[in-house]
Amino acid sequence: MDTELLKTFLEVSRTRHFGRAAEALYLTQSAVSFRIRQLENQLGVNLFTRHRNNIRLTTAGEKLLPYAETLMNTWQAARKEVAHTSRHNEFSIGASASLWECMLNAWLGRLYQLQEPQSGLQFEARIAQRQSLVKQLHERQLDLLITTEAPKMDEFSSQLLGHFTLALYCSSPARKKSELNYLRLEWGPDFQQHETGLIAADEVPVLTTSSAELARQQLSALNGCSWLPVNWANEKGGLHTVADSATLSRPLYAIWLQNSDKYSLICDLLKTDVLDGQ
């Protein structure tokens, strides 16, 4: 049996709501419904009664619940034990490409400089979309996530690392937004709410990317503008703020599992300022 089906069943039974379960699992509501149907088909029973917004476990669902919890706990314990034997000196950090390029690469360098030679700690710098990294963190495939959005799941702990400033940049001085094409650099779903009020409603990006370096290199060729971190843009040089634009402050969070067996190491690593110079 697919453990993902059991995990989805447990989340729906906990929230009694397909939409909230989908949000907690970082899935679409249709994906949650599909998984529940798959599980019901495998077992040959209905697990939930659905009447408008009132979702309840059936008798079969109530009987399955303790077994599903035991199976998932056993599976998680097995994964943790196997992972521990092969990863005791490894530490994985996940973030988007733009965060690695603009600030985390320098932080990683400082971490290596501060490590004791005998520690033997091996870092893995993992680049992926936030949704994928959250799933990896939840499944103990990732130790630490650095992101611009606070966690939405109860089993996650987090620390606000600080804030950094974004400005709208182009490749030549004294340009206005109306004269430029928009290059969308992905800073997370919640950033799109701010973005909507800062660009024209009918503005269609000529390029969408998760890489700040790629966006920077395309500004001149595409006669474009993009939201870039101020300190990073100043270091790169050759960039100019768009004349009729504002600046935005973005938070940066470190997120990890509450019961992570690497909690003490996480605390030690976060003593080194991630936003040093930002």
Curated annotation (Swiss-Prot):
GO terms for biological process: negative regulation of DNA-templated transcription. Keywords: DNA-binding, Repressor, Transcription, Transcription regulation. Residues 18-37 bind DNA. PROSITE patterns: HTH_LYSR (PS50931). The keyword Transcription regulation applies. Residues 1-58 form the HTH lysR-type domain. GO terms for molecular function: DNA binding; DNA-binding transcription factor activity. InterPro entries: LTTR, LysR_subst-bd, Tscrpt_reg_HTH_HdfR, Tscrpt_reg_HTH_LysR, WH-like_DNA-bd_sf, WH_DNA-bd_sf. Negatively regulates the transcription of the flagellar master operon flhDC by binding to the upstream region of the operon. Belongs to the LysR transcriptional regulatory family. HAMAP family: HTH_type_HdfR. This is HTH-type transcriptional regulator HdfR. The lineage of its organism: Bacteria, Pseudomonadati, Pseudomonadota, Gammaproteobacteria, Enterobacterales.
